[in-house]
Swiss-Prot record:
Gene3D superfamilies: P-loop containing nucleotide triphosphate hydrolases. This is ATPase ASNA1 homolog. It is found in: Cytoplasm; Endoplasmic reticulum. Keywords: ATP-binding, Cytoplasm, Endoplasmic reticulum, Hydrolase, Metal-binding, Nucleotide-binding, Transport, Zinc. The lineage of its organism: Eukaryota, Discoba, Euglenozoa, Kinetoplastea, Metakinetoplastina.
C-alpha cells in the first residue's frame, strides 16, 4: 500500500488517535499531523471554490504533556489557538485536576453551602454547622481520593471526549495519546461504563437509595441558611451532559426550595442519558469513516512487538487502524562512506523493518528518517509533516537538517 498518510489526509475523518510505546515520537507525529491537516483545506460544496479551511483541535491525553514543548507555546486545559495557525489549529492539554475540582467535589466540601442562619435557633444552628462540617470532612477525603484514583487520567480524558462528541466547532480532533496501556484503558471505557451502568441500574433499590441519600445531604447542607447547593447534579463531571440530559434539569436547579435532592426518576433519566452518549461515542469509535488510529513505533524489538499487541487490541475493540509510522530510521545516501555505528543500527532496523513489512502488508507504513535535531516549532513540524505524505529517499532528499529547513 501507499507508504504515506495521504489517504488519511484526504478522508473525512472526525477523530484520529496517535499512539504507541513511550519515547517513539508520538507527540512529534501527532503535532506534525495536526499541522498538516490544518494547512489542508476540506471539501465543501457550499464554498465558492469547493473547499474551506479545516478546523483542527489537537488534544494531549498523556499525563506528561509535551504539546507545549513541540509548539514552543504554552497550552492549558482549554483550546488555545496555535501561533501561526490561529484560524485552523488549536491545542489543549487535558488536566485530570480540572475533573476532580468540579462543582460536585466543591459542593461536597461545603464550598457552596454558605448563607444566613439567622432564622435558626442557636442549638439548631450548632447542629447544622456540625453536620455540614462532617460532610465537608468527608468531601475533602473524597476529593483527595478522586485526585489519586486509578484511572482518573482516562476518565478525565473521556469526559473531554464526551464534551466534544456533539460539538460542531471542529472538523477534526487529533488525540496525542499516552503510552499504550493508558490508551487501551481509555478506548475500553465506553464498553466498561456501559456494562457498569447496566449492572447498577438493574439493582432495583439503587435509585431510591440515592434519592434518600440526596435528601439527607440536602437537608444537612441546606440547614445553614437554606441556600441550594448549585451544580450538584450527578453528571457534573461530564461537561456535555449538564445541559442536555432529558429530565435532569431539576437535579441542579430544582433545589430552589432550599435543599439539594434528586429523585429516583432523575437518577434513571441521567443514567439513560449517559448511556446514550457513551453509545454514541462507541459508535464513533467503531466507525472507520469517522475514527482511525495511527500507530507510531521504532524499528526495535520492544516497540515492534508492543505495536503488534496494540493492533490486536484495536481489532478487539473494533477500532480502525491501517497506518503505522516508523520513526528514527538511520537512512544514509548510498554515496556516503560506511560508518560502523550506522551500519550496526541499520542492520538491526532492517531486521525489524522486514518483520513490519511482513506483518502489515495491508497497512500504510510510513518510514521516517532519524533527524539531526529536535523537531520544535511550526516550521520544523511542517518539514517533518512533508515526509508523512511524501516517501523519504536519502539519495533524493539527502540529510534533513532541521535548523536549515526552518
Amino acid at each position: 500500500m501507499d507508504p504515506t498518510l495521504t489517504e488519511l489526509l484526504h478522508s473525512n475523518l472526525q477523530w484520529i488517535f496517535v499512539g504507541g510505546k513511550g519515547g517513539v515520537g508520538k507527540t512529534t507525529t501527532s503535532c506534525a499531523l495536526a499541522t498538516l491537516f490544518a494547512t489542508t483545506p476540506i471539501s465543501d460544496a457550499a464554498a465558492p471554490d469547493g473547499t474551506r479551511p479545516r478546523r483542527v483541535l489537537l488534544i494531549s491525553t498523556d499525563p506528561a504533556h509535551n504539546l507545549s514543548d513541540a509548539f514552543n507555546q504554552r497550552f492549558g486545559p482549554q483550546p488555545t489557538p496555535v501561533k501561526g495557525l490561529e484560524d485552523t489549529l488549536a491545542a489543549m492539554e487535558v488536566d485530570p485536576k480540572n475533573f476532580t475540582h468540579g462543582a460536585l467535589m466543591s459542593s461536597l466540601t461545603g464550598a457552596n453551602s454558605g448563607g444566613s442562619a439567622s432564622s435558626l435557633s442557636r442549638e439548631a444552628e450548632a447542629d447544622a454547622v456540625e453536620q455540614t462540617a462532617s460532610f465537608a470532612r468527608i468531601g475533602a477525603v473524597l476529593k483527595e481520593a478522586a485526585r489519586t484514583m486509578p484511572g482518573i487520567d482516562e476518565i478525565s480524558v473521556f469526559a473531554e471526549i464526551l464534551h466534544y462528541v456533539r460539538t460542531l466547532s471542529y472538523d477534526l480532533l487529533i488525540f496525542d495519546t499516552a503510552p499504550t496501556g493508558h490508551t487501551l484503558r481509555l478506548l475500553a471505557l465506553p464498553q466498561t461504563l456501559n456494562s457498569t451502568f447496566d449492572r447498577l441500574m438493574s439493582l432495583e433499590g439503587l435509585a431510591p437509595m440515592l434519592e434518600a441519600a440526596s435528601h439527607l445531604i440536602g437537608s444537612s447542607l441546606g440547614a445553614v441558611g437554606g441556600d441550594s447547593v448549585s451544580g450538584c447534579e450527578v453528571a457534573t463531571a461530564m461537561p456535555s451532559s449538564s445541559s442536555t440530559a432529558p429530565g435532569a434539569g431539576s437535579a441542579a436547579t430544582g433545589s430552589s426550595q432550599g435543599s439539594w435532592s434528586i429523585t429516583a426518576d432523575e437518577v434513571r433519566a441521567k443514567a439513560l442519558h449517559w448511556r446514550q452518549v457513551m453509545e454514541e461515542v462507541q459508535d464513533r469509535f467503531n466507525d472507520p469513516s469517522r475514527t482511525s488510529f495511527v500507530c507510531v513505533c521504532i524499528a526495535e524489538f520492544l516497540s515492534v512487538y508492543e505495536t503488534e499487541r496494540l493492533v490486536q487490541e484495536l481489532m478487539k475493540y473494533n477500532i480502525g487502524c491501517d497506518s503505522i509510522v516508523v520513526n528514527q530510521l538511520v537512512l544514509k545516501p548510498s554515496s556516503e562512506p560506511p560508518c560502523r555505528m550506522c551500519a550496526a543500527r541499520q542492520k538491526i532496523q532492517t531486521k525489524y523493518l522486514e518483520q513490519i513489512d511482513l506483518l502489515y502488508d495491508d497497512f500504510h507504513v510510513v518510514k521516517m528518517p532519524l533527524l539531526s535535531d529536535e523537531v520544535r516549532g511550526i516550521p520544523a513540524l511542517k518539514m517533518f509533516a512533508r515526509f508523512l505524505q511524501e516517501p523519504y529517499n536519502p539519495d533524493t532528499h539527502g540529510y534533513i537538517d532541521v535548523q536549515e529547513s526552518c
